[in-house]
């Protein structure tokens, strides 16, 4: 009997037009629909069907396709098949295999490819899948089998487990194949390399030729109709079958899949939201289209919206993708009637503006603007970039700053009279007002107390009816209601009464300038005389008397002076409290000999008054080159002398440096606009006299004033702007309309919003509901903004006046066009003499020709190009360090210079490998590449006198240092001991004077991860939910903005004594830290690198460690041999240490040896087994280069093409190898320069190399290289490493004491003191975390590896000893087998506390834990640690009093 479920199934077959399919009836006999799961949100219907047996694959596939097709307009369809009597066969397993792999949900294309290349089979009822080897098996087990098994079951197969076995036959074939490959001759391999390179070259050319030329806009798929409805991205919230969007591409990636296809991934925004758009390639033309699409274009996309399992986000899978033309804003004003922006902020305005000056200048050029100003907040750091952008775009740059102007000190007393303060009668008054503007707001309460001798003798208190309802803000602030003022006396009547009340008195108020402004405005309004009585403002008086206070509000002062203050913000109570506060202050003023009213202002400006004034903004533009230098000086003083929260410019400093500058009145925070808004036309006119031009801005930029009720409404705002124009005309000063630009386009406002949000309460803009619209406006947009002024006035302020101002300003250059080096008298002769003296001392009175020629060539370059002083400075620094007992290591290519060697700057000798006799000066040079390093020459006695010969020379060309012509500015980097670095830095002040040396300044900008954090915080705090692509977009918009400043860790810039620093840059303190020891350049040092000499005086651990090793052992490190066989044995095994590789978990003994201790380099050592200094040089070069070892030299060695001595290791190898092979030296140099910078080798140069029989493998290796290490740098590092390794081999405890004291920061003291098992357990714990281990844990693991090695060598660690331990150094104990831990090894115990413990112990032994805590400044948690680990067993808890 047919069931209802069977009937439903037959209905389904009819619905999908399947019931008459011939030959398929049998397999669906008794088939049922068990249930249908409907997923509403994802629009997926899952049919659960029950059938007898597994369907034949072709039936299943056709049925599945027909089902999906039938429901395509309703939902996506999935099926789950339940079988009653399933029978598995090899046929069925194989037929379904590809479908199962594809639909298993396996994300990894590599795993999919692995799976597709195999087919499972049945063996004794087990399903078997073969793998070539254990690695492939592991991949399949971990990542593929589970999804594959589930997918089989879903389509009707019974549950089974796939068993993965290694295909022994296949594995053996692979092994035999490898052996066969190994057995091939070098000639065959070389020929293969030739063919590969040739094929690669042909393929490149072929691909260039075959790739279709993309002309015009990119189109992938079909053309999308212009009439197609566009969906805004913000409205896409769930999966959709078809949607069309358009937007701006802001990021692009093309991934190559293992299948050979390519995947295009775009991040696109329409500025309502952002989406990832994906498209797979189908043809080579598609791939060419992928390459043609770039970030920065607009596209229209039609596709489906789906949840991407990998991204865990909705993405758009594109069917059709069309590049479209997007009309950006244009400036359509006539050519000679374009505006110029005179107020603009770049991303160097700290955390406040988003675009680079380069972007603005480019846009100005696009719009046809002839000039643009850069006026960042208090900084000039965009000047160098602006200069370059201006030159590139042919746009004139106006160099300026928006400065924070402060008065040098405001008066305390006004209308001064010689009146005795103690005998005077005072009126202390306060007002309550409807707002902050004396011009537009009204007094609603006026109250005062009259006082004599500190006593109240009369009071005055009146409400005033303002004639309109009070705002809620006013009511909340003043506690005055409409009922209280309604029907009160008029303003005129109250003001007349108050004027009478004040006769013959001194008037006093707190922040009285505010109240006096309101009073005088009211008096003026009613034709009464303004205040003539002497008056005092207690706010600046308090700042003078109590500079230590941080705030000077009335309630703060009342608390300090013990004055009771009730009902604050009610006028009568505030007035009375101010009176008592004033009398208390008067006593303190008398102690400073302030006895009369006219004594107060003698003290104006004292006690850092500039800190207490509220800064007002002003635009300062450099008019001339002299003005630019004055701007540098003025900015420097604001940063170095007058920095307080922001860099401040006292008015007197601006006057001092005003020559060549133009000063404008700036924005709403400028004093002229503020005065017009709050104090009225007359006061504004007085303020405006100071400025060269006035400034107004579009109304949207003043919206915060409306929000804060500082301006009542739009009419008030237009009146203020109109009055600003009127004022400028009256004073005959130009007035200009500016944009106060902070970002490029309106839609970019969100980036600034995110930056400001990140600063929380520190930025007052966060109190605004909406930030002002401060985008870069076109001429048309600006004219429209000021249309309310009338067409003529709008054009005057938008176009005419700004252009006139531009024409008044000279062409200015903020950066120099050449290098200015310091001069040291006699430097040339000193360098010559130092060089020749050592050369003769080493090589004899008559120098060998090779030495003489090299020195002649170098001295001509060094002296002839004015580089002597650079060499001499370095020589003096190194000489002083050596004299003080610290070796100096050289970095970079300075070791390529024989003059540097002869003057003692570097130990590296760049001559070819050679012998020299220290006694009779006999020499012998190997000039044909027979040896890679002189240190590898066999030991030999002098054939003339029998003295043991010195072996030297690294065969490094001079050209790698100063270029082929010898005119490249030398960059001498020196590695001083980290302990000695500050001394070396300060020695430059001795050499050149404090005002001629500065630390190289740096600019810290918002990094990608930081920006991402800002966006996530903004998303959280504003309760929004951004897609991943939108987060990426917003983070990109916030990236690159100046966040702080700093200093280069080593760079010292030297100003020549015939110039001053302001010829190059302003100066400041790093991160505005006024306590810093050094001042830095204001400009990032990279921008002036080619103009001023930079010394790189680095701090490094190796010289510090060498010094400690020398101190502990008494051995001079310079006497250590460079070819000691025991030391060399470290690099190929562990026997020399007396341990096995298993014990120390390393196949070499180089743990803790600089340059050779990392896992990566140890792996290289295991593969290469270096035995010579030259090979160690190669290893150093290979490990620091990019694409020099991995995929290059490593493969050449593995396949037997070359051996270790032949590979390219350092950049200099290329030049010297090619010269030895017969390539001309200049061509060899050019090839080396191209290769080391990753530029490849041009075809014609390759032809020259082949003509000189350069092997093809060598050319191929060069073509892969992206970056190479200088050989001189490698030589200096390896030399230092060998010296340290020597102590590790022969003076182990000395080595370990130095290592743990100098190089280690993180310790597991408990494990180390308990022995090797505990250390091994700690290592295993960290290793088990894999990539989840923290950076601190990874650093600790390195330390534990060294600790384990030391323990395995038979030495021990001892826990801290309260009576013996050093503050920071590990010390060797009397038994010669134990290292005692210092106090800093205790977790959480810093160096300062460690030193305090030792200092206190030296004064007197600790008698208790309480004593240790008090005198040693040791916290309870540290006491607990020491107690738990038996450090304090001999100390009682508390001090005890003894009677005996």
Curated annotation (Swiss-Prot):
GO terms for cellular component: cytoplasm. Gene3D superfamilies: 1.10.150.870, 3.30.1900.20, 6.10.140.1510, Metal-dependent hydrolases (3.20.20.140), Nucleic acid-binding proteins (2.40.50.140), PolC, middle finger domain (1.10.150.700), Ribonuclease H-like superfamily/Ribonuclease H (3.30.420.10). Keywords: Cytoplasm, DNA replication, DNA-directed DNA polymerase, Exonuclease, Hydrolase, Nuclease, Nucleotidyltransferase, Transferase. It is found in: Cytoplasm. Its main location: cytoplasm. GO terms for molecular function: 3'-5' exonuclease activity; DNA binding; DNA-directed DNA polymerase activity. Its EC number is 2.7.7.7. Belongs to the DNA polymerase type-C family. PolC subfamily. HAMAP family: DNApol_PolC. This is DNA polymerase III PolC-type. The gene is polC.
């Amino acid at each position: 009997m047919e069931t209802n479920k069977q009937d439903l199934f037959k209905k389904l077959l009819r619905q999908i037009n399947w019931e008459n399919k011939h030959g398929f009836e049998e397999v669906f006999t008794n088939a049922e629909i068990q249930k249908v799961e409907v997923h509403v949100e994802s629009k997926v219907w899952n049919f659960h069907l029950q059938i007898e047996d597994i369907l034949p694959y072709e039936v299943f596939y056709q049925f599945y396709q027909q089902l999906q097709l039938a429901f395509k307009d309703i939902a996506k369809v999935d099926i789950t098949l339940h079988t009653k009597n399933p029978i598995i066969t090899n046929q069925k397993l194989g037929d379904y295999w590809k479908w199962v792999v594809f639909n298993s949900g396996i994300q990894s294309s590599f795993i999919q490819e692995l799976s597709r290349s195999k087919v499972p089979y049945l063996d004794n009822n087990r399903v078997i899948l073969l793998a070539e080897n254990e690695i492939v098996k592991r991949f399949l087990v971990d990542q593929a089998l589970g999804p594959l098994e589930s997918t089989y079951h879903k389509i009707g197969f019974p549950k089974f487990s796939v068993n993965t076995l290694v295909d022994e036959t296949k594995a053996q074939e692979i092994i035999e194949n490898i052996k066969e490959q190994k057995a091939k001759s070098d000639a065959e391999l070389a020929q293969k390399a030739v063919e590969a390179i040739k094929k690669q070259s042909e393929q490149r050319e072929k691909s260039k030729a075959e790739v279709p030329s993309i002309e015009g806009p990119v189109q992938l798929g079909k053309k999308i109709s212009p009439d197609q409805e566009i969906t805004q991205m913000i409205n896409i919230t769930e999966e959709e079958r078809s949607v069309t969007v358009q937007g701006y591409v802001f990021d692009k990636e093309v991934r190559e899949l293992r299948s050979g296809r390519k995947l295009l991934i775009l991040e696109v925004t329409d500025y309502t939201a952002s989406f990832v758009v994906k498209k797979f390639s189908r043809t080579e033309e598609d791939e060419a289209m992928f390459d043609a699409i770039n970030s920065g274009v607009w596209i229209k996309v039609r596709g489906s919206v789906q949840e991407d399992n990998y991204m865990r986000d909705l993405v758009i899978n594109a069917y059709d993708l069309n590049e479209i033309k997007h009309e950006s804003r244009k400036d359509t004003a006539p050519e000679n009637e374009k505006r110029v922006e005179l107020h603009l902020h770049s991303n160097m305005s700290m955390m406040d503006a988003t675009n680079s000056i380069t972007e603005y200048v480019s846009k100005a050029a696009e719009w046809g603007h002839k000039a643009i100003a850069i006026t960042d907040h208090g900084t000039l750091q965009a000047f160098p970039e602006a200069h370059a952008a201006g030159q590139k775009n042919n746009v004139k740059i106006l160099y300026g700053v928006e400065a924070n102007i402060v008065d040098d000190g405001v008066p305390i007393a006004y209308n001064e009279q010689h009146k005795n303060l103690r005998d005077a009668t005072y009126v202390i008054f306060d007002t309550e007002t409807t707002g902050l503007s004396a011009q537009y707001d009204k007094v609603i309460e006026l109250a005062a107390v009259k006082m004599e001798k500190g006593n109240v003798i009369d009071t005055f208190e009146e409400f005033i009816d303002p004639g309109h309802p009070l705002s809620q803000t006013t009511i909340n602030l003043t506690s005055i209601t409409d009922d209280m003022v309604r029907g009160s006396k008029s303003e005129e009547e109250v003001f007349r009464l108050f004027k009478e009340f004040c006769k013959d008195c001194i008037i006093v108020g707190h922040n009285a300038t505010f109240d006096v402004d309101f009073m005088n405005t009211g008096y003026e309004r009613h034709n009464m005389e303004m205040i003539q009585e002497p008056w005092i403002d207690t706010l600046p008086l308090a700042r003078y008397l109590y500079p230590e206070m941080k705030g000077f509000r009335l309630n703060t002062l009342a608390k300090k002076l013990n004055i009771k203050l009730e009902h604050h913000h009610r006028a009568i109570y505030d007035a009375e409290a101010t009176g008592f506060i004033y009398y208390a202050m008067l006593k303190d003023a008398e102690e400073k000999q302030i006895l009369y009213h006219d004594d107060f202002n003698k003290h104006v400006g004292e006690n850092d008054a500039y800190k207490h004034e509220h800064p007002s903004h002003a635009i300062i533009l450099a008019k001339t080159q002299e003005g630019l230098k004055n701007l540098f000086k003025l900015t420097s003083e604001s940063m170095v002398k007058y920095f307080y929260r922001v860099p401040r410019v006292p008015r007197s400093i601006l006057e001092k440096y005003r020559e060549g500058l133009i000063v404008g009145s700036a924005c709403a925070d400028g004093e002229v606009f503020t005065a017009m808004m709050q104090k009225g036309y007359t006061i504004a006119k007085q303020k405006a006299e100071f400025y060269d031009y006035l400034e107004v801005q579009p109304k949207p930029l003043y919206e915060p004033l409306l929000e804060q009720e500082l301006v009542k409404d739009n009419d008030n705002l237009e009146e203020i702007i109109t009055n600003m124009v009127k004022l400028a005309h009256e004073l005959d000063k130009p007035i200009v309309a500016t944009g106060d630009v902070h970002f490029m386009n309106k839609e970019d406002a969100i980036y600034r919003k995110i930056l400001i949000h990140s600063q929380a309460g520190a930025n007052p803009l966060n109190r605004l509901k909406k930030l002002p619209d401060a985008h870069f406006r076109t001429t048309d947009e600006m004219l429209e903004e000021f249309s309310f002024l009338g067409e003529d006035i709008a054009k005057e302020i938008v176009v005419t006046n700004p252009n006139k101002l531009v024409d008044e300003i000279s062409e200015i250059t903020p950066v120099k066009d050449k290098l200015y080096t310091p001069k040291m008298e006699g430097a040339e002769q000193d360098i010559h003499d130092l060089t020749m003296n050592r050369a003769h001392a080493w090589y004899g009175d008559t120098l060998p020709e090779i030495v003489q020629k090299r020195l002649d060539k170098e001295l001509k370059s060094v002296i002839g190009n004015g580089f002597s002083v650079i060499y001499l400075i370095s020589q003096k620094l190194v000489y002083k360090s050596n004299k003080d007992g610290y070796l100096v290591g050289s970095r970079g290519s300075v070791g390529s210079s024989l003059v540097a060697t002869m003057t003692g700057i570097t130990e590296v000798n760049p001559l070819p490998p050679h012998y020299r006799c220290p006694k009779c000066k006999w020499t012998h040079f190997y000039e044909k590449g027979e040896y890679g390093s002189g240190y590898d020459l066999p030991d030999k006695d002098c054939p003339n006198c029998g003295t043991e010969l010195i072996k030297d020379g690294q065969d490094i060309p001079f050209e790698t240092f100063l270029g082929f012509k010898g005119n490249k500015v030398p960059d001498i980097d020196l590695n001083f001991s980290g302990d000695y670095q500050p001394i070396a830095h300060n020695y430059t002040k001795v050499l050149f004077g404090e005002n001629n040396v500065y630390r190289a300044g740096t600019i810290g900008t918002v990094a990608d991860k930081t920006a991402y954090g800002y966006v996530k915080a903004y998303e959280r705090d504003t309760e929004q939910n951004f897609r991943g692509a939108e987060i990426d977009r917003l983070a990109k918009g916030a990236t690159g903005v100046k966040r702080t400043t700093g200093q280069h860790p080593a760079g010292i810039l030297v100003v020549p004594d015939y110039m001053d620093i302001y010829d190059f840059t302003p100066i400041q303190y790093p991160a505005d830290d006024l306590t810093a020891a050094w001042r830095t350049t204001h400009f990032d040092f990279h921008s002036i690198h080619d103009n001023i000499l930079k010394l790189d005086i680095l701090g490094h651990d190796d010289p510090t460690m060498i010094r400690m090793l020398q101190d502990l052992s008494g051995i001079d490190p310079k006497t250590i041999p460079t070819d000691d066989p025991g030391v060399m044995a470290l690099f190929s095994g562990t026997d020399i240490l007396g341990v096995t590789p298993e014990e120390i978990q390393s196949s070499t003994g180089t743990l803790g040896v600089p340059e050779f201790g990392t896992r990566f380099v140890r792996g290289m050592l295991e593969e290469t087994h270096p035995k010579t200094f030259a090979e160690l040089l190669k290893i150093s070069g290979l490990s620091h280069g990019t694409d020099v070892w991995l995929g290059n030299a490593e493969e050449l060695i593995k396949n037997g093409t070359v051996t270790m001595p032949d590979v390219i290791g350092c950049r200099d190898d290329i030049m010297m190898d090619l010269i030895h092979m017969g390539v001309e030296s200049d061509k060899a140099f050019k090839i080396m320069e191209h290769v080391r910078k990753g530029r490849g080798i041009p075809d014609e140069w390759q032809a020259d190399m082949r003509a000189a029989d350069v092997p093809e493998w060598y050319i191929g290796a060069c073509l892969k290289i992206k970056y190479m290490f200088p050989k001189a740098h490698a030589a200096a590092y390896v030399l230092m490493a060998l010296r340290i390794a020597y102590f590790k081999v022969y003076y182990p405890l000395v080595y370990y004491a130095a290592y743990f004291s100098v190089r280690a920061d993180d310790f597991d003291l408990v494990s180390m003191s308990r022995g090797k098992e505990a250390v091994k357990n700690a290592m295993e714990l960290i290793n088990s975390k894999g990539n989840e281990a923290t950076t601190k844990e990874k650093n600790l693991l390195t330390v534990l590896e060294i600790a384990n090695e030391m323990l395995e060598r038979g030495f021990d660690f001892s826990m801290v000893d309260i009576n013996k331990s050093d503050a920071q150094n590990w010390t060797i104990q009397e038994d010669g087998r134990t290292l005692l831990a210092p106090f800093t090894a205790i977790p959480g115990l810093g160096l300062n506390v460690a030193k305090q413990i030792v200092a206190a112990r030296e004064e007197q032994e600790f008698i208790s834990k309480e004593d240790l805590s008090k005198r040693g400044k040791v916290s309870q948690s540290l006491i607990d640690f020491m107690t738990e680990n038996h450090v304090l067993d001999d100390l009682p808890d508390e001090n005890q009093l003894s009677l005996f």
